[in-house]
Amino acid sequence: MHNLKLASVVVGLAMASSGFAATQIEWWHAMGGANGEKVDEMAKAFNDSQSDYEVKPVYKGNYTETMTSAIAAFRAKQQPAIVQVFEVGTASMMAAKGAIYPVYQLMKDSGQPFDESVYLSAVTGYYSNSEGQMLSMPFNSSTPVLYYNKDLFKKAGIDQAPKTWQEVESVAKKLQASGVTCGFTTAWQSWVQLENLSARHNVPFATLENGFAGVKTELTFNGPLQVAHIEKMGEWQKNGIFSYSGRTNDGAAKFYSQECAMFTESSAGYAGIKRNATFDFGVSELPYWEGKVQQPSNTIIGGASLWVLQGHSKEEYKGVASFLSYLSKASVQADWHQFSGYLPITKAAYDLTKEQGFYAANPGTETGVMQMTTGTPTANTKGLRLGNFVQIRGIIDEALESVWSGDVDAQTALNTAVERGNAQLRRFEKAND
């Protein structure tokens, strides 16, 4: 009898505890290091703010590894509720209609207040459909800017950052005359020197609104503007005005060591530069070619967004919607922006950061935001939506490296890259049209 009573008590306690157990939500991400620790902190803050849901962040490696893991997990029916996908994977995610739960629909179905107009249009446009409905939630967005070594500039008698590429050339020559080895280097050469070059000058990178209007898009980055720019950079590589440093952000080392006085890199690189630079540095907007455009357009974003995957319970999705609302709060976004250097995704987060005096205390951190919100995005500046974009970027990297080495002229290199890239687009079209 005693054992029966004990058993009933144990069962009762188990039922009670299960009734109060928080619904778990798995979030796969690609944020390593300090940013990864911050992601854990954000999830914990949400978990501590309520008792219904528990978000469990899981680091899955770099962007490519995280996306690949999510695809494999979905096929095995073991997918997370949320996955962070970099911007070049957007077209692939959109094409996987049976795999994704569009954010705008999720928020509506879950009864969460959701106003797309509060987000920065230059950011949300990248992740919205043709009706302007957000398919994924922007999380860590960035845009390229120009960092420059103020100490080396002062030594060379230069008092301000170059605004145009013509000025970059003249400034670099003055720097070299003062003893600096190289004028500038770049990170992410395809993203900065072709994709954003095109947007900055309101020139198409691909047809059909850079892929936004359909999968039959074709690449056009072998046009006169792009060819002239890459040809000039090839000349600069020969005389030291430009120094190639690799396909990712390896150029940071040359900037830190003061080998190169200027560095085109993501706005999100600010925190790392501030931590590693032993000199006074400034941040300026990405240069443009004077005479090629009357007024430079907005640049386009890099980084990643959060996609919600199908195959979970209604209760889990209510939790996901609640978590995404939490991440969009001005205080949360402002803190993430100020910590990481990524752009604030809402106007409220931007305004709060300004009110808190962050931009005044950290000159240059507002540059990316100002540059991204220059005018209204056009068909050429709202972003890129290309299938097999990871492979296309690899093709572009090979083409640019052949120019830097002097093996091929810019026109031939870009023509070849367009031809090879279009073959990738046709494969994607065949699989998804």
Give, region by region, the residue ranges found by the protein language model.
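Short, solvent-exposed loop/beta-turn-alpha elements that line the ligand-binding surface or hinge
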Residues: 104-119, 203-228, 275-276, 288-298, ...
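Extracytoplasmic/periplasmic solute-binding protein
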Residues: 130-139, 144, 169-218, 260
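Extracytoplasmic "Venus flytrap"/periplasmic binding protein-like
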Residues: 41, 45-119, 151-163, 254, ...
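C-terminal capping/gating helix-and-loop segments adjacent to ligand/active sites or protein-protein/ligand interfaces
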Residues: 129, 299-300, 364-420
